[in-house]
Amino acid sequence: VAAIYPITPSSPMAEVADDWAAHDRKNLFGQTVRIAEMQSEAGAAGAVHGSLKAGALTTTFTASQGLLLMIPNMYKIAGELLPCVFHVSARALAYHALSIFGDHSDVMACRQTGFAMLASNSVQEAEDMALVAHVATLKSSVPFLHFFDGFRTSHEIQKIDEIAYEDMAKLLPAEKVAEFRARALNPD
Protein backbone atom coordinates (compact mmCIF):
# COMPACT_ATOMS: atom_id res chain seq x y z
CA VAL A 1 0.00 0.00 0.00
CA ALA A 2 1.15 3.55 -0.70
CA ALA A 3 -0.84 6.20 1.16
CA ILE A 4 -0.26 9.49 -0.60
CA TYR A 5 -1.10 13.15 -0.54
CA PRO A 6 0.79 14.85 -3.38
CA ILE A 7 2.96 17.74 -2.18
CA THR A 8 5.73 19.35 -4.20
CA PRO A 9 8.58 18.30 -4.51
CA SER A 10 7.58 14.73 -3.59
CA SER A 11 4.66 14.61 -6.05
CA PRO A 12 6.58 12.79 -8.82
CA MET A 13 7.15 9.78 -6.54
CA ALA A 14 3.44 9.48 -5.77
CA GLU A 15 2.56 10.05 -9.43
CA VAL A 16 4.89 7.26 -10.56
CA ALA A 17 3.47 4.87 -7.94
CA ASP A 18 -0.06 5.81 -9.03
CA ASP A 19 0.87 5.29 -12.70
CA TRP A 20 2.36 1.88 -11.95
CA ALA A 21 -0.81 0.88 -10.09
CA ALA A 22 -3.02 2.16 -12.93
CA HIS A 23 -1.04 0.07 -15.42
CA ASP A 24 -1.11 -3.00 -13.14
CA ARG A 25 2.68 -3.10 -12.79
CA LYS A 26 3.58 -5.79 -10.27
CA ASN A 27 5.90 -5.26 -7.32
CA LEU A 28 8.47 -7.68 -5.90
CA PHE A 29 5.65 -9.75 -4.36
CA GLY A 30 3.82 -10.08 -7.68
CA GLN A 31 1.09 -7.69 -6.55
CA THR A 32 -0.12 -4.33 -7.80
CA VAL A 33 0.50 -1.61 -5.23
CA ARG A 34 -2.70 -0.19 -3.80
CA ILE A 35 -2.72 3.59 -3.84
CA ALA A 36 -4.75 5.46 -1.24
CA GLU A 37 -4.84 9.20 -2.00
CA MET A 38 -5.80 10.98 1.18
CA GLN A 39 -7.25 14.42 1.98
CA SER A 40 -4.10 15.64 3.78
CA GLU A 41 -0.62 14.61 4.82
CA ALA A 42 -1.91 13.82 8.30
CA GLY A 43 -4.51 11.55 6.69
CA ALA A 44 -1.81 9.82 4.66
CA ALA A 45 0.21 9.14 7.82
CA GLY A 46 -2.90 7.84 9.59
CA ALA A 47 -3.62 5.56 6.63
CA VAL A 48 -0.04 4.28 6.74
CA HIS A 49 -0.43 3.48 10.45
CA GLY A 50 -3.75 1.70 9.96
CA SER A 51 -2.51 -0.24 6.96
CA LEU A 52 0.59 -1.36 8.84
CA LYS A 53 -1.53 -2.50 11.80
CA ALA A 54 -3.56 -4.58 9.34
CA GLY A 55 -0.37 -6.31 8.15
CA ALA A 56 0.17 -4.59 4.80
CA LEU A 57 3.65 -3.43 3.88
CA THR A 58 3.07 0.30 3.45
CA THR A 59 4.97 3.43 2.45
CA THR A 60 4.38 7.11 1.76
CA PHE A 61 6.07 10.05 0.06
CA THR A 62 6.14 13.59 1.43
CA ALA A 63 8.09 16.81 1.98
CA SER A 64 8.35 19.92 4.10
CA GLN A 65 5.20 20.95 5.99
CA GLY A 66 3.58 17.67 4.98
CA LEU A 67 6.19 15.75 6.95
CA LEU A 68 5.53 17.89 10.02
CA LEU A 69 1.84 16.94 9.87
CA MET A 70 2.86 13.27 9.94
CA ILE A 71 4.86 13.49 13.18
CA PRO A 72 2.06 12.38 15.58
CA ASN A 73 1.55 9.16 13.62
CA MET A 74 5.30 8.68 13.29
CA TYR A 75 5.51 8.38 17.09
CA LYS A 76 2.81 5.68 17.01
CA ILE A 77 4.45 3.78 14.16
CA ALA A 78 7.88 3.83 15.84
CA GLY A 79 6.46 2.99 19.27
CA GLU A 80 4.65 -0.03 17.87
CA LEU A 81 7.77 -1.19 15.98
CA LEU A 82 5.98 -1.21 12.64
CA PRO A 83 8.34 -1.59 9.68
CA CYS A 84 7.80 1.08 7.04
CA VAL A 85 9.63 3.74 5.06
CA PHE A 86 8.68 7.38 4.56
CA HIS A 87 10.41 8.72 1.43
CA VAL A 88 11.02 12.44 1.93
CA SER A 89 12.03 14.98 -0.65
CA ALA A 90 13.59 17.37 1.88
CA ARG A 91 13.12 21.10 1.52
CA ALA A 92 12.94 24.25 3.60
CA LEU A 93 10.00 24.87 5.86
CA ALA A 94 7.92 27.96 5.19
CA TYR A 95 8.48 29.82 8.46
CA HIS A 96 7.19 33.22 7.39
CA ALA A 97 7.16 32.97 3.59
CA LEU A 98 6.96 30.12 1.11
CA SER A 99 10.36 28.67 0.31
CA ILE A 100 11.23 25.98 -2.18
CA PHE A 101 14.92 25.79 -1.29
CA GLY A 102 16.31 22.43 -0.32
CA ASP A 103 17.40 21.96 3.27
CA HIS A 104 16.84 19.44 6.03
CA SER A 105 14.78 21.43 8.53
CA ASP A 106 11.75 19.23 7.82
CA VAL A 107 13.72 16.03 8.39
CA MET A 108 15.52 17.33 11.49
CA ALA A 109 12.14 18.08 13.09
CA CYS A 110 11.55 14.29 13.09
CA ARG A 111 14.72 13.21 14.89
CA GLN A 112 12.90 12.47 18.16
CA THR A 113 10.14 10.29 16.63
CA GLY A 114 12.05 7.01 16.79
CA PHE A 115 12.46 6.69 13.02
CA ALA A 116 15.91 5.77 11.73
CA MET A 117 17.15 8.18 9.07
CA LEU A 118 18.93 7.41 5.83
CA ALA A 119 20.05 10.06 3.32
CA SER A 120 20.63 9.88 -0.43
CA ASN A 121 22.66 12.32 -2.50
CA SER A 122 21.78 11.37 -6.09
CA VAL A 123 19.09 9.69 -8.14
CA GLN A 124 21.06 6.42 -8.14
CA GLU A 125 21.55 6.59 -4.37
CA ALA A 126 17.85 7.34 -3.91
CA GLU A 127 16.94 4.05 -5.56
CA ASP A 128 19.69 2.10 -3.81
CA MET A 129 19.01 3.55 -0.37
CA ALA A 130 15.26 3.12 -0.79
CA LEU A 131 15.90 -0.63 -1.08
CA VAL A 132 18.32 -0.55 1.86
CA ALA A 133 15.71 1.29 3.95
CA HIS A 134 12.97 -1.23 3.12
CA VAL A 135 15.21 -4.22 3.89
CA ALA A 136 16.53 -2.62 7.10
CA THR A 137 13.06 -1.75 8.40
CA LEU A 138 11.91 -5.32 7.88
CA LYS A 139 14.97 -6.76 9.61
CA SER A 140 14.84 -4.36 12.56
CA SER A 141 11.15 -3.38 12.89
CA VAL A 142 12.40 0.20 13.17
CA PRO A 143 10.66 2.55 10.73
CA PHE A 144 12.89 4.54 8.37
CA LEU A 145 12.78 8.06 7.02
CA HIS A 146 14.64 7.99 3.69
CA PHE A 147 15.40 11.53 2.54
CA PHE A 148 17.13 13.38 -0.26
CA ASP A 149 17.32 16.92 -1.61
CA GLY A 150 13.97 18.27 -2.71
CA PHE A 151 13.81 19.47 -6.30
CA ARG A 152 17.49 18.80 -7.07
CA THR A 153 17.24 15.03 -6.67
CA SER A 154 13.47 14.55 -6.80
CA HIS A 155 13.11 16.25 -10.20
CA GLU A 156 16.44 15.26 -11.75
CA ILE A 157 16.26 13.25 -14.97
CA GLN A 158 19.06 10.71 -14.78
CA LYS A 159 19.66 7.21 -16.06
CA ILE A 160 20.23 4.75 -13.26
CA ASP A 161 21.15 1.10 -12.93
CA GLU A 162 17.85 -0.36 -11.77
CA ILE A 163 18.01 -3.16 -9.27
CA ALA A 164 16.34 -6.26 -10.70
CA TYR A 165 13.54 -7.91 -8.72
CA GLU A 166 15.61 -11.10 -8.64
CA ASP A 167 18.42 -9.26 -6.85
CA MET A 168 15.96 -7.56 -4.50
CA ALA A 169 14.43 -10.91 -3.60
CA LYS A 170 17.84 -12.18 -2.46
CA LEU A 171 18.01 -9.33 0.08
CA LEU A 172 14.41 -9.57 1.27
CA PRO A 173 14.06 -11.21 4.70
CA ALA A 174 11.00 -13.34 3.85
CA GLU A 175 10.77 -14.69 7.41
CA LYS A 176 10.54 -11.12 8.76
CA VAL A 177 7.76 -10.30 6.30
CA ALA A 178 5.88 -13.38 7.53
CA GLU A 179 6.45 -12.38 11.19
CA PHE A 180 5.18 -8.86 10.48
CA ARG A 181 2.04 -10.14 8.78
CA ALA A 182 1.42 -12.62 11.61
CA ARG A 183 1.35 -9.72 14.12
CA ALA A 184 -1.41 -7.94 12.19
CA LEU A 185 -4.66 -7.01 13.86
CA ASN A 186 -7.31 -9.38 12.60
CA PRO A 187 -11.02 -9.21 13.46
CA ASP A 188 -11.28 -12.99 13.16
Feature-to-residue mapping (PLM):
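Conformationally flexible catalytic loops at phosphate/diphosphate-handling active centers
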Residues: F29-V33, F144-D188
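Intrinsic-disorder/low-complexity, polar/charged segments
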Residues: F29, S40, S122-V123, D188
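Thiamine diphosphate
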Residues: V1-A109, G114, L131-V132, G150-F151
